[in-house]
C-alpha cells in the first residue's frame, strides 16, 4: 500500500516540530498539521511569554536595589500596553521562525485542525491524507473546575492578553503555573492573593523547597490562603467576588481571577476511537497533571495502534518542553534513523520561575527515604543571604540542599531556592545525571565569590 506521507504529525508544538524535522533529515516525507500559531504551548502561551513576563517583573526590585549601591533612580512606571504588545510580537516572531525551520527541513505545513479517520488516514478540513506512520503531539490545555461563575475566570492562555494591568489578581491553584504567575504579577505591582487547597504550595516538590518559596512569597507581599477552595465567583460592582470554603474566610474582591488548577491532554475531537488508540485509565494519578484521556504509550512512544505514536504532554509522562523534544527525536531516530532507542525520563532537571525562584533535579528527600529507608539517606543543607543583598537592606535568602545515599555516597538529588537557581541547577544536573558522589562534589573547587560554590562546600 502506498501513502501520501511516510509520517504525518498532528500538532506543531515542541514535540511535533522536533520529531518532524528529525524524521525529514533521514529522508522521510513528512507533513505536520497545526490549527494555531506554530510553536505550541511553550512558544505561544507558555514558557517563552511567561519567562519574558518574569524578566519584566524583576525591574521594580532592581530599581530599589540600585539605591543601596548609590544609584539615584527616578520614579518607575510600567507601560502595560507596551509590555504586553512586545511579548506578543516576540511570540509571533518565534512562530514564524519555526515555520522557516520546517521549510528548510522539507516538512510540509498544513494549516487546520487534524482528526483521525482511521489508523492511516488524517482529515484536515475537507482534505484527507494518508501516512505510513502518524505521530500525535497535540499537547494539553488548561481545565477549569465546574463551579458557579467560573466563566469569569481566565487561564494561563488568556493572561498574556490582558488589556490592562490588574490592581488585584486572585489565583486558584498552587502548582508551578499558579505560583509563577503569583510572583510575576506581584513583581509587576499588582496585589496578589493565592488560594491553595493544601497547607503549602507546590505539592510534589521537596518539602524544603515548598517551605522556602512560600515564606519568600509571603515576604514579597503575596497573600497565600491555605486549606481553602473556591466555591463560587460572582460579578459585583467592585469586580469579582470570590467565595471560599473556610468558615471564617471572608470573600475576596479582585478584578482578575486566574484559574490554575490543572491541565488535561488535548484530545477532544481528535478521533482516537476511529483509529483504535487507547487512553490511560483516568483513575491513575499523574505528576501534577490530569491523566484523564492521556494517550497510553510504551517506552518507544508507541500507542495501542502499532503505526501511531504520541509524544509530549498528551501522554502525561513528564510534562516539560525539553522532554517533549527528547521524546520526539527519540521516536524519529527509532522509526526513521535506524537507531532504536528509548528516551530516559530519569533525573530530569526542572525549575519554578517563581519569586523566589526554585530548581531541582533528582529525588526529593521524601522520595529518597521512601526508596532507601530513613537511615540510608544523608541530607546536606545550607541557607544564607547572598552577597548581592549586602547593600539592599533586603532579607532575601538562598537555600541549597543535597540528598545523598549514605551507603554509596551517590548524590540522589539537588535542590535550590533563590536567585539564579535554574542556571545553577542546570550545571549541577550534569553531575547528578552522571552519578557523581558527595566526595566528587567536595573535590571540586568552587568559584569564589559565588552562590553556586556552596554546592561544593557543604559539609
Curated annotation (Swiss-Prot):
Transmembrane segments: none annotated. InterPro entries: FAD/NAD-bd_sf, FAD/NAD-binding_dom, FAD/NAD-linked_Rdtase_dimer_sf, GSHR, GSHR/TRXR-like, Pyr_nuc-diS_OxRdtase, Pyr_nucl-diS_OxRdtase_dimer, Pyr_OxRdtase_I_AS. It catalyses: 2 glutathione + NADP(+) = glutathione disulfide + NADPH + H(+). Disulfide bonds join 42-47. NADP(+) binds at residues 177, 180, 197, 203, 262, 351. It is an enzyme of class 1 (oxidoreductase). One of its GO terms (cellular component) is cytosol. It is found in: Cytoplasm. Binds 1 FAD per subunit. Glutathione binds at residues 14, 329. FAD binds at residues 14-15, 34, 41-42, 50, 114, 313, 321, 448. One of its GO terms (molecular function) is glutathione-disulfide reductase (NADPH) activity. The active site is a redox-active disulfide bond. Homodimer. Belongs to the class-I pyridine nucleotide-disulfide oxidoreductase family. NCBIfam families: gluta_reduc_2, PRK06116.1. PANTHER family: GLUTATHIONE REDUCTASE. Catalyzes the reduction of glutathione disulfide (GSSG) to reduced glutathione (GSH). Constitutes the major mechanism to maintain a high GSH:GSSG ratio in the cytosol. This is Glutathione reductase. It comes from Nostoc sp. (strain PCC 7120 / SAG 25.82 / UTEX 2576). The lineage of its organism: Bacteria, Bacillati, Cyanobacteriota, Cyanophyceae, Nostocales. The gene is gor.
Amino acid at each position: 500500500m502506498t501513502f501520501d506521507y511516510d509520517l504525518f504529525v498532528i500538532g506543531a508544538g515542541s514535540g511535533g516540530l522536533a520529531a518532524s524535522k528529525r524524521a525529514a533529515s533521514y529522508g522521510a516525507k513528512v507533513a505536520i498539521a497545526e490549527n494555531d500559531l506554530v510553536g505550541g504551548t511553550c512558544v505561544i502561551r507558555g514558557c517563552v511569554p511567561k519567562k519574558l513576563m518574569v524578566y519584566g517583573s524583576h525591574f521594580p526590585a532592581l530599581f530599589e536595589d540600585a539605591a543601596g549601591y548609590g544609584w539615584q533612580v527616578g520614579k518607575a512606571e510600567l507601560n502595560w500596553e507596551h509590555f504586553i504588545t512586545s511579548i506578543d510580537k516576540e511570540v509571533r516572531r518565534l512562530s514564524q521562525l519555526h515555520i522557516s525551520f520546517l521549510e528548510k527541513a522539507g516538512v510540509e505545513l498544513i494549516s487546520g485542525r487534524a482528526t483521525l479517520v482511521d489508523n492511516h488516514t488524517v482529515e484536515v478540513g475537507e482534505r484527507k491524507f494518508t501516512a505510513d506512520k502518524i505521530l500525535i503531539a497535540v499537547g494539553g490545555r488548561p481545565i477549569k473546575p465546574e463551579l458557579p461563575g467560573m466563566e469569569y475566570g481566565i487561564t494561563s492562555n488568556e493572561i498574556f492578553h490582558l488589556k490592562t494591568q490588574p490592581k488585584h489578581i486572585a489565583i486558584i491553584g498552587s502548582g508551578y503555573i499558579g505560583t509563577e504567575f503569583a510572583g510575576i504579577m506581584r513583581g509587576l505591582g499588582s496585589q496578589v492573593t493565592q488560594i491553595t487547597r493544601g497547607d503549602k504550595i507546590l505539592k510534589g516538590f521537596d518539602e524544603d523547597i515548598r517551605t522556602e518559596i512560600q515564606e519568600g512569597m509571603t515576604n514579597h507581599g503575596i497573600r497565600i490562603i491555605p486549606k481553602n477552595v473556591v466555591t463560587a465567583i460572582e460579578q459585583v460592582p467592585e469586580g469579582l467576588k470570590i467565595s471560599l470554603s473556610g468558615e471564617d474566610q471572608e470573600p475576596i474582591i479582585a478584578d482578575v481571577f486566574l484559574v490554575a488548577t490543572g491541565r488535561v491532554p488535548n484530545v477532544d475531537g481528535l478521533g482516537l476511537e476511529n483509529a483504535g488508540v487507547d487512553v490511560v485509565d483516568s483513575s491513575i494519578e499523574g505528576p501534577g497533571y490530569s491523566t484523564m484521556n492521556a494517550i497510553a504509550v510504551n517506552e518507544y512512544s508507541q500507542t495501542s495502534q502499532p503505526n501511531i505514536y504520541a509524544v509530549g504532554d498528551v501522554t502525561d509522562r513528564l510534562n516539560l518542553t525539553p522532554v517533549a523534544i527528547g521524546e520526539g527525536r527519540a521516536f524519529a531516530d527509532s522509526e526513521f534513523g535506524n537507531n532504536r532507542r528509548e528516551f530516559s525520563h530519569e533525573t530530569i532537571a526542572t525549575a519554578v520561575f517563581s519569586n523566589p525562584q526554585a530548581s531541582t533535579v533528582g529525588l526529593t528527600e521524601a522520595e529518597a527515604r521512601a526508596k532507601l529507608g530513613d537511615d540510608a539517606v544523608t541530607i546536606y543543607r545550607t541557607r544564607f543571604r547572598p552577597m548581592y543583598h549586602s547593600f539592599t537592606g533586603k532579607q532575601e535568602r538562598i537555600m541549597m540542599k543535597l540528598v545523598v545515599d549514605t551507603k554509596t555516597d551517590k548524590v540522589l538529588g539537588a535542590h535550590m531556592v533563590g536567585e539564579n537557581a535554574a542556571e545553577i541547577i542546570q550545571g549541577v544536573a550534569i553531575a547528578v545525571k552522571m552519578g557523581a558522589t558527595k566526595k566528587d562534589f567536595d573535590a571540586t573547587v568552587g568559584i569564589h565569590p559565588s552562590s553556586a560554590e556552596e554546592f561544593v562546600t557543604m559539609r
